[in-house]
């Protein structure tokens, strides 16, 4: 890594999200944490500053967003009064569905970073809102890790709300850290699949993918959770069937979507799974940035039984098959990394615009940030976390996000595209959520 990097060219993965935001295909992520103390500015500002000085990407922004190659460049300072806001009478669900609709972080104001924090829920919940161009889902928990450290340290009196950014160098983008160049086979396959020629899609019948995206993106998000007791049951089930938590959530989500949209009959469902790429990169595991791969799993001719007594058998079959295939993909990430490399062969803005003329690429998307533990004996604790991508996904109409706190609940958010009928969208979200929780409870009992 360069000894000191004030600015660099944006990578293609970063540019993909930049162009989405320019085209009002909003690409923001939120990760919130509920703390055990009141987050007044006197205690919060020093804690946020602690995160800023330890994570150089928090001091960066995108310049020249309309050019072919935007620049990631450090600011000199950040005014905390401009990035820390209080709405302590609001809850995260109403905040997400109201304040964050059509919300995007401004590329035109060159004094601001591409993130903000809002304090909600009687000053106990801190919502970190950030642009996907510079940060992935895994960056959210890292931010709260440093804020928690800052809250546990001796307090610093601020004479001014304006603070300097980190002196650490900007981390390199994903494409500089791993080989993403697609093979000839990968290139030919991509060209053939998108050629529009007869049989170019193969012999597989179409999958359910919902309607085409509509700009500006809009969605409805609901939050829900399962208790630590249920989490323990799922952990035991995971051991018994040798499948990961993500695999279990995947299978239950697929069943829930099927019962919500298909009623009966066979259907093809495609699931996109976000994969934290830090495990494959020679960078510190604690580095904030946009380091994410995607893996797509195809479920062909899916027609589960309508009988509740068959739920567990179907779920186990789905979870074990998916877990096996995902483990194989993770053992050799070359296929996933090549998908990032393909972005160098397309006009991203043109690709995004054309995506609004056809159905989305997949049925659903799931992102599980994982299991997070914090010091149990500290004076300040994180009691709960939530994670959402509250704007409609370009890739799928249904998006499930998961995050778990040690000795606490496992929290979910479900975002569903909103095509203008918000009431109907809300009803569909409730239907999928209720089915998800019902199946999850049944399959985890007596595990």
From Swiss-Prot:
It comes from Schizosaccharomyces pombe (strain 972 / ATCC 24843). This is Uncharacterized protein C18B11.03c. Disulfide bonds: none annotated. It is found in: Membrane. It is a multi-pass membrane protein. InterPro entries: Alcohol_O-acetyltransferase (IPR052058), Atf2/Sli1-like (IPR010828). GO terms for cellular component: cell division site; cytosol; endoplasmic reticulum; ER-to-endosome phospholipid transfer complex; lipid droplet; nuclear envelope. GO terms for biological process: intermembrane phospholipid transfer. The chain crosses the membrane at residues 28-48, 241-261, 397-417. Keywords: Membrane, Transmembrane, Transmembrane helix. GO terms for molecular function: alcohol O-acetyltransferase activity; N-acetyltransferase activity; phosphatidylserine transfer activity.
């Amino acid at each position: 890594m360069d000894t000191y990097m004030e600015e660099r060219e944006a990578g293609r993965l970063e540019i993909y999200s930049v162009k989405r935001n320019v085209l009002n295909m909003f690409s923001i992520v939120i990760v919130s944490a509920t703390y055990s103390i009141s987050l007044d500015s006197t205690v919060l500002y020093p804690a946020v500053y602690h995160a800023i000085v330890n994570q150089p990407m928090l001091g960066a922004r995108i310049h020249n967003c309309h050019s072919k190659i935007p620049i990631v460049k450090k600011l000199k300072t950040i005014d905390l009064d401009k990035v820390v806001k209080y709405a302590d009478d609001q809850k995260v669900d109403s905040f997400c569905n109201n304040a964050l609709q059509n919300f995007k972080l401004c590329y035109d104001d060159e004094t601001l970073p591409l993130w903000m924090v809002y304090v909600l829920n009687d000053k106990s919940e801190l919502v970190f809102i950030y642009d996907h161009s510079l940060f992935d889902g895994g960056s959210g928990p890292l931010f709260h890790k440093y804020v928690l450290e800052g809250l546990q340290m001796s307090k610093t009196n601020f004479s001014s709300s304006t603070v300097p950014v980190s002196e650490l160098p900007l981390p390199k983008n994903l494409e500089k850290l791993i080989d993403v160049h697609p093979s000839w086979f990968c290139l030919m396959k991509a060209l053939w699949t998108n050629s529009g020629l007869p049989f170019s899609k193969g012999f597989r019948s179409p999958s359910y993918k919902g309607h085409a995206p509509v700009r500006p993106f809009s969605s409805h998000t609901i939050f829900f959770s399962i208790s630590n007791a249920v989490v323990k049951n799922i952990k035991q089930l995971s051991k018994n069937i040798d499948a990961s938590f993500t695999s279990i959530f995947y299978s239950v989500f697929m069943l829930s979507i099927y019962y919500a949209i298909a009623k009966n009959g066979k259907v093809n469902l495609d699931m996109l799974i976000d994969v934290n790429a830090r495990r494959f990169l020679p960078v510190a595991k604690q580095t904030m940035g946009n380091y994410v791969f995607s893996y797509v799993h195809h479920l062909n001719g899916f027609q589960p039984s309508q009988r509740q007594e068959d739920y567990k058998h179907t779920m186990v079959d789905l979870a074990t098959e998916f877990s096996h295939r995902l483990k194989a993909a993770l053992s050799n990430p070359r296929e996933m990394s090549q998908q990032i490399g393909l972005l160098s062969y397309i006009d991203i803005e043109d690709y995004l615009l054309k995506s609004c003329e056809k159905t989305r690429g997949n049925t659903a998307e799931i992102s599980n940030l994982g299991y997070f533990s914090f010091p149990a004996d500290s004076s300040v604790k994180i009691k709960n976390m939530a994670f959402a991508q509250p704007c409609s996904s370009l890739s799928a109409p249904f998006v499930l996000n998961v995050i778990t706190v040690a000795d606490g609940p496992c929290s979910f958010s479900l975002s569903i595209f909103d095509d203008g009928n918000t009431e109907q969208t809300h009803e569909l979200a409730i239907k999928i959520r209720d089915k998800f929780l019902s199946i999850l409870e049944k399959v985890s009992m007596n595990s």
